[in-house]
Swiss-Prot record:
Residues 27-73 form the F-box domain. This is F-box/kelch-repeat protein At4g19870. CDD domains: F-box_AtAFR-like. Kelch repeats lie at residues 146-192, 194-240, 242-284. InterPro entries: F-box-like_dom_sf, F-box/kelch-repeat_ARATH, F-box_dom, Kelch-typ_b-propeller, Kelch_1. Residues 1-33 are annotated as: Disordered. Residues 1-10 have a biased composition (Basic and acidic residues).
Length: 400
């Protein structure tokens, strides 16, 4: 039966190319090529096309989900940055992860298209397989092409688990667990290591208050005891500043010096923006507090620590304010592909279905007027609709 069915298939293919001068001039289908050649072709195009190509055939889907494809992309130096978003809600059995899909055919400016069509066509949150072992954790960090989810809660109990999301294949695996279970540890990446501090209410002095994970060797090492004052300190933020791990809050900060292995109290105030990112060695921050007009919005920071507002974003800030972005602290600012991305939870005034919107804006930057930084809003729209109880937990950028 298979031999009899084969000739009609070939005949059908020739019929579709009847307009060609000769049968030999018809182009072969990409799916008819060996997997190695298909893999090489797919490695040369933007990852934005992969969701569409993955539904062409099982063979394409298998190649697109393989790690070999991303090894080929790396060899071709065709890696690109992608945004991963995590949403958490009591109605979810586990936190849900998404990729921010960018329409490769969208125009440079989506603002005009938005006026013509209400339907989102530029960017969407596309779900990826969730881990049924992943804890509900507010501590996650991107390292290259992977995302580390550290600590949190599993079935209401504190967890020492570390789960890794490989963003090349969107698959999960376990990393070695921490030495201590932590609810919400504060984490910071520096020099190939993840520093983890605090994250629980009570702990005996014999148990490590802080530890560090070596990404290369995949091993944990406990840090020296910081003393009673630091153990009991209030921590709102953590950041690496000039080779030291700073943590605390604006009025009172501490630091750990990895080179000396010492803890210290810091003099003066250290600003810990709620949302920040670095692009081309420039720090950008976003503050939600619109009560003080100077603090509300996006700033860029010079090397001498002076912050100045990114100009030209007034219309975006109005949209952000009007759609609930300034009412909470969930706004996320990330740098991706040489542009700034702003994501936030938007609350609806008339909301009979108890739903809210996740908004996204894409901002291109350019320098004008003697070094002033201006933002050009290329696109702003809703990328997802969720229950009002849902939280925008993480927004991270990986390189794949």
């Amino acid at each position: 039966m298979k031999r009899q069915a084969k000739p009609p298939e070939k005949k059908t293919k020739r019929t579709t190319n009847a307009s060609s001068p000769t049968p030999s001039s018809s182009s072969p289908s990409l799916s008819s090529l060996p997997d190695e050649i298909v893999e090489n072709c797919l490695a040369r195009i933007s990852r934005s096309y992969y969701p569409t190509l993955s539904i062409v055939s099982k063979s394409f889907r298998s190649i697109i989900s393989s790690t070999e494809l991303y090894v080929a992309r790396s060899h071709l130096r065709n890696t690109e940055e992608c945004v991963y978003v995590c949403l958490s809600d009591k109605s979810f059995e586990f936190p849900k992860w998404f990729t921010l899909w960018v329409n490769p055919n969208q125009a440079n400016s989506m603002v005009e298209k938005k006026r013509k069509k209400k339907k989102t066509i530029g960017k969407l949150l596309v779900p990826i397989p969730s881990s049924n072992l992943s804890p509900v954790s507010k501590s996650a960090i991107a390292v290259g092409s992977e995302i580390y989810v550290i600590g949190g809660k599993v079935d209401g109990a504190l967890s020492s688990a570390v789960r890794i999301l490989d963003c090349r294949s969107n698959t999960w695996r376990d990393a070695p667990s921490m030495t201590v279970a932590r609810k919400r540890p504060f984490i910071c990446l520096y020099d190939g290591k993840i520093y983890v501090i605090g994250g629980y209410n009570k702990l005996s002095e014999s148990e490590p208050w802080a530890e560090v994970f070596d990404i290369k060797t995949q091993t944990w090492e406990c840090l020296s005891d910081p003393g009673t004052e630091i153990r009991n300190c209030t921590i709102y933020r953590i950041a690496e500043i000039e080779g030291k791990i700073h943590f605390g809050y604006t009025q009172k900060t501490y630091a750990y010096d990895p080179k000396q292995g010492e803890w210290e109290c810091c003099e003066g105030e250290v600003a810990f923006p709620r949302s920040q990112c670095v692009m081309e060695s420039v720090l950008y921050t976003f503050a939600n507090n619109y009560t003080w007009e100077d603090d509300y919005g996006c700033k860029w920071w010079s090397t001498d620590g002076y912050g100045e507002k990114v100009k030209g974003l007034e219309s975006l800030l109005e949209i952000h304010k009007r759609n609930g972005g300034s009412s909470d602290n969930t706004t996320k600012l990330v740098a991706c592909g040489g542009k700034l991305l702003l994501l936030w939870e938007g609350y609806m005034k008339h909301n009979p279905n108890n739903r809210k919107k996740i908004w996204c804006a894409v901002i291109a930057l350019e320098k004008r007027d003697g070094g002033k930084v201006w933002g050009i809003v290329e696109w702003v729209d809703v990328v997802h609709i969720v229950p009002t109880s849902c939280k925008l937990l993480h927004c991270l950028v990986v390189s794949v």
